[in-house]
């Protein structure tokens, strides 16, 4: 009996010894960042932030996968604990356009969101079968195209690009909304698809992981900026180069491509403790930026902390913007009930 009592006392003493450490661990703010698919670039960028930035800011950052940018807007707005989101520029702009056009839900979602910083350009890949007659993006009109899951940034980019290039939406009979993996099976095995659209910053894990034999099954379509259809697209998107060095198992030479800008976004928080925590995050982001560029995903080398002027309707989050600008100045850091449109469905604004 005495031995049991002694054991209980020792256990209690040990628990009290560890209590300060446990309390200290609990002071880390349990925040979340929503990214995209497990095999995409967004989630790798999120993990870099969790590793190199969050700890110094006193944040325990959970990096969560998602369907993509449109879902991220909704989760940032409504999901408890989600303080950061990765969002593509065309998705953000589409919500603003829907708001301007009178879509009340779009306004409720997008108006309180604020930009932390622009990140980098994400390449938009158009994948066809190796034996396909298609060679260029401007040739995909009337093709059967997988645009990615609803609520994904990929779906927004694919449908917006198509609409801009060919003056109309992809017909529903030709559009599918499968995951990348499911779509590639439909493309190469079932042959019920002609094109699979993937959006990811290079080197994209999905393509990097492909074996040399993949070249016999698939190819990447080139983007010819000189074509009339292409010229309509570059008003919203950006010319890019898909490098053979990024995908040696797929490419023997660099090919011309197209890209969309990625942004790190938050909410217009007003609670004092949250504002202070986000200011610490911004300070840590600046202070650890060199580590992100040297040890993080290669896309960090394309990021610039200068915070350029944003488009109409886009707003920075002032407490974080002030912190970043102050830090960079000192450190000189470089570098409704109706028929739903396709865009509304992609954004998750269709309730029918």
Give residue ranges: language-model regions:
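C-terminal segment of classical bacterial N-terminal signal peptides
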Residues: 13-22
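Extracytoplasmic
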Residues: 28-30, 40, 56-58, 68-71, ...
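Extracytoplasmic small-molecule ligand-binding "clamshell" domains
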Residues: 28-34, 41-87, 250-254, 346
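Bilobed "Venus flytrap"/periplasmic-binding protein-like clamshell domains
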Residues: 30-54, 122-186, 190, 307
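Pocket-flanking alpha-helical
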Residues: 50, 62-106, 183-187, 203-211
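Pocket-lining segment of extracytoplasmic ligand-binding domains
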Residues: 89, 164, 169-272
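A structural signal for short loop-to-beta-strand junctions that line the ligand-binding cleft
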Residues: 105-119, 124, 247-255
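Segments of small-molecule ligand-sensing domains
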Residues: 251, 255-352
């Amino acid at each position: 009996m005495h031995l049991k009592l002694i054991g209980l006392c020792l256990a209690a003493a040990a628990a009290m010894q560890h209590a300060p450490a446990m309390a200290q661990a609990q002071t880390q703010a349990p925040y979340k960042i929503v990214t995209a698919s497990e095999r995409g670039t967004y989630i790798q960028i999120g993990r870099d932030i969790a590793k190199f930035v969050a700890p110094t800011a006193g944040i325990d950052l959970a990096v969560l996968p998602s369907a993509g940018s449109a879902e991220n807007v909704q989760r940032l707005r409504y999901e408890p604990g989600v303080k950061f989101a990765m969002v593509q520029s065309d998705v953000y702009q589409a919500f603003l356009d829907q708001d301007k056009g009178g879509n009340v839900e779009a306004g409720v979602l997008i108006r309180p969101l604020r930009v932390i910083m622009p990140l980098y350009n994400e390449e938009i890949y158009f994948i066809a079968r190796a034996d396909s007659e298609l060679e260029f993006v401007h040739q995909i009109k009337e093709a059967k195209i997988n645009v990615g899951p609803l609520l994904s940034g990929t779906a927004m980019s694919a449908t917006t690009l198509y609409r801009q290039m060919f003056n109309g939406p992809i017909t529903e009979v030709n559009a599918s909304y499968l995951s990348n993996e499911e779509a590639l099976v439909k493309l190469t095995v079932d042959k019920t698809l002609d094109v699979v659209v993937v959006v990811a910053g290079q080197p994209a894990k999905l393509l990097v992981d492909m074996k040399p034999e993949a070249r016999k099954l698939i190819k990447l379509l080139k983007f010819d900026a000189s074509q009339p259809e292409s010229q309509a697209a570059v008003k919203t998107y950006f010319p890019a180069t898909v490098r053979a060095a990024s995908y040696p198992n797929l490419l023997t030479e660099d090919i011309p491509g197209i890209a969309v800008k990625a942004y790190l976004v938050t909410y217009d928080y007003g609670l004092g403790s949250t504002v202070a925590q986000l200011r610490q995050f911004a300070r840590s982001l600046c202070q650890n930026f060199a580590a992100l560029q040297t040890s993080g995903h290669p896309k960090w080398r394309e990021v610039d902390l200068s915070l350029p002027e944003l488009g109409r309707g886009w707003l920075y989050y002032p407490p974080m913007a002030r912190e970043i600008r102050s830090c960079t100045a000192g450190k000189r850091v470089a570098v409704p009930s109706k028929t739903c449109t396709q865009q509304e469905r992609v954004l998750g604004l269709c309730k029918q």
